[in-house]
Curated annotation (Swiss-Prot):
Lineage per the UniProt record: Eukaryota, Viridiplantae, Streptophyta, Embryophyta, Tracheophyta
The protein's enzyme class: transferase
Stored PANTHER family: 3-KETOACYL-COA SYNTHASE
Protein name per UniProt: Probable 3-ketoacyl-CoA synthase 20
GO MF terms, alphabetically ordered: fatty acid elongase activity
Family label: Belongs to the thiolase-like superfamily. Chalcone/stilbene synthases family.
Tissue: Highly expressed in leaf sheaths. Expressed in leaves, flag leaves and panicles.
Active-site residues, record numbering mapped to chain: C237, H317, H401, H405, N438
Highest taxon, organism lineage: Eukaryota
Function comment: Contributes to fatty acids elongation. Plays a role in controlling leaf anatomy and plant architecture.
Gene Ontology CC entries for this record: membrane
Amino acid sequence: MDRELVRTVKLATKNHAGVLFRRAVRHLPHIVAVTALVAAAPRLSTLLAAAAAGGSTMRWARALWSDLAGELGPSAPALAVACWAAALAAYTYAASRPRPVYLIDLAGYKAPREHEASRAKTIAHFGRCGRFSGESMAFQKRMLERSGLGEATHFPTSLISLPVDMCLRTAREESHAVIFGVVDEVLRKSGVAAADVGVLIFNSSLLSPTPSFTSLIVNRYGMRPGVVSHNLSGMGCSAGIIAIDLAKRLLQVHENTYALVVSTENITLNAYMGNNRPMLVTNTLFRVGGAAILLSNRAADRRGRAKYQLIHTVRTHRGAHDQSFGCVTQEEDDAGEVGVSLSKELMVVAGEALKTNITTLGPLVLPISEQLRFLATVVLKRVFRADVKAYLPDFKLALDHFCIHAGGRGVLDELEKSLKLSPWDMEPSRMTLYRFGNTSSSSLWYELAYCEAKGRIKRGDRVWQIAFGSGFKCNSAVWRALRTVDAAGLDAGDNPWMKEVDMLPVDVPKVAPIDETSYQIPN
């Protein structure tokens, strides 16, 4: 039995044991209550007689105790202690249960029309920058034709004006527009005052100024001095789920409060203006975007107000492997130009991270039949050296909607095949890539908003969000819809898709040639 099998079996066993333990403990109060009823049943006549005679609850209890003491004799005190211990255990369990975390509402940023850039406009502006060689321009054009992006993704003004203005001032302007736009919207939609927010988490991987963006939000919205704030940077496109997981953990500690999570990425300072091919890919994929998510642990919010309940978060970090650690890096080229380099091993690394992540997630959500099939193929392959393909569980048996990080067409194609998903399952991710491009950690929320705008979300549905990011990380979140989201009740101010949702989906060819004559830069 090789080490890979041992590791897989150990992990699966640990996950199953954890699930079984949680299920047993979850029903502990019911077990204690039923046990007490069974024990009291033979003395029901005593209780009824005491009740008929009138008197307080304590009198009934004394009557029951006298009856028991007469039967048990010297062992009665021990039984009393055992009963009190059971009651204390039940209370302790109830007090220590994880607090449910609810998603009240979300907002996705949609830049004004003047920020829209067709693919022809994008190539034209790249050409006028004067920094790219002819070979680099041809490469970016080929990548853009195969990227899956549409004709109305958004760039910051700094990159579609001439000359290009990449500086800290314009980077702040871009981030401020996104942050204030989504925070204003989510607070308006939810009706929650900024002063009521107890936890604030912000993530932006490539821009982390001083004061931090969390301080900017606290200052702008006049949040209370006791707000618990965290500013995450350098964590890549999977940072949105990391922020949700962190918020979940903080909401276990801070009672009866709201958590505001803001996810975005800055494009201005991270466009690459050199000629190193691995660093040019990001120019063709990343676009302006951001999202704000309002969470709550208030029990009152579950009834009619919250949209979803967070069921699971699973985080996988493969940074211990050099290949995984180095496949997405921010660096300088030989000319001193800064950019993000994507290695050729990215797809392999992402596949390994996904496999590790779903090995942990599977026992939490999949039916036992699927888990046994998966384990059986591992044993056949590793122990008996049988020539069988590794069995990938059918997650559609447990999950209804899939929001996969819109990192690029290649990533989506690979996951569609690996997870055996249908075009309908992939539609939210593909349309997000087409309409908004790769918006980094916020892409998952555009995808969920797409599902809502299409009227897909029904009460009880489960949504799986899957994110990949540098490091290398693969993170998952599973949500359960607490109510049906009525698409007819949404307007353009509630959802970034509403103005065009009826025109989607569209067919996106694998190669869509760019007609450079369709756009001319004004003189």
